[in-house]
Amino acid sequence: MTGDSRSISEPSINLDPDNTSFSDENSDDFFMDNSYDIDEIDHSDESNRQSVIVDSKVTVPPSKHSTLTLSDSEDSDAKEQHQSLSRSSSKNVNIEDITEPKPDKPSGRTRGRSVMKESVVEINSSESDLDEDKNFPRSRSRSRSSIRSISPAGKYKRQKSSLLYTYDENDDFFKELAKEAKKSTTISKESTPDQRKRVYNIKFLSKLEGTINKAVQVKVLGKYEFSKILPAALDGLMKSYKIPKVMKDIYKVENVTLYWNNAKLLTFMTCNSLHIPQDFENEVSDIDVTIVSKEYEKNFEATLESKLKEEEAALLIKERQEMERKLEKKRNEQEESEYREFESELKNVEETQEIKENDTVMNTKLLQEGGSLSGNSSSMEEVMRIALMGQDNKKIYVHVRRSTPFSKIAEYYRIQKQLPQKTRVKLLFDHDELDMNECIADQDMEDEDMVDVIID
């Protein structure tokens, strides 16, 4: 049943994805705003490591054109020293003779400062030194590198840079793990792209004061939470049934509870999370949701519980009745089978009795005095006794005369063994089959001879 073919009498609210804030494409992923990708972190930036300050208190030495501010006495001493240095340079006097001796063991930051101060004095002391600096512009950078190497922070910086270039296989593993965790978060929220586009037609049945057993319908996508759908449904109830402002607090989201299929719904749940089966593609699924005031929530749940118990009891009674019906059917089938078997046995007994009666009639005709079989000869003919040996190795004795045919002997054996009338009986004497048309005299049988009987 689709939403177009269903006639709806209740007021309906269509939350169109193009006209409401619910369908904003930018709001699809609510939990991914603060996410980040580990791959976006750039570990190859060398500028950060190069801009590390080794010693914040070390001052950069002044340039060649910087001036020193001296007092008057120091200025006169400096001029005299400059003149003496210029004279000594003309006489090829070594500049090291006028250089002040350095302290033996400068400590800490004083060491760097003293070196820098002396370098400044040497630069300003002689023009020849200035020429040397021009010829060797890298001498100052060497002095700076020597000053920087004195600080222990420089060693720590080199160790840090070496650690950044160390490759670890676990880095790739953790990157892949973070990607999988990001994917699983997205999948748990919305399992498939088709499920995000699935449409539901929700019928909100009100149990609130003023709209009891009244309903509104809202058509939404399955990805939206009930916390976003419920305000529109409550507003639709108030507008459709003209609820006064005095009762407005009853229709607030925080004052109501939702129930579906005798179960409580939480506001963060979605229609897709209910896992309602879909009969065909693009089907608009119908959902009936009951709105109950939190004030009567316990009473409603108690009513639901009693209703469930009644349904369970009715289900148990129905199952018991179904089981009894099956047992009764099985019992009837068994009785019918037994009755049929009894009828079959009774029929066989009747047939056997009928055969016996027929055999008795024939036996009466065939048997004569002493159980002997008579032929066409007179009663004065000599009677002899022969044995009929069956396949069960049991003997039946019969009295015959010399004129008794073998056909009558075979018929007598069939009657005594209660065999069917159509049974074929063969007689053998000295391993030769006897002709049923012959008689005892034809085989020269004597008293107490034995004849073998074979049943086909």
UniProtKB/Swiss-Prot annotation:
Residues 1-24, 83-93 have a biased composition (Polar residues). Residues 301-360 form a coiled coil. The modification Phosphoserine is found at residues 90, 125-126. Present with 1890 molecules/cell in log phase SD medium. May be a substrate targeting component of a cullin-RING-based E3 ubiquitin-protein ligase complex RTT101(MMS1-ESC2). Involved in HMR and telomere silencing via the recruitment or stabilizing of the SIR (silent information regulators) complex. Component of a cullin-RING ligase (CRL)-like complex composed of at least the cullin RTT101, a linker protein MMS1, and the potential substrate receptor ESC2. Interacts with RTT101 and MMS1. Interacts with SIR2. This is Protein ESC2. It comes from Saccharomyces cerevisiae (strain ATCC 204508 / S288c) (Baker's yeast).
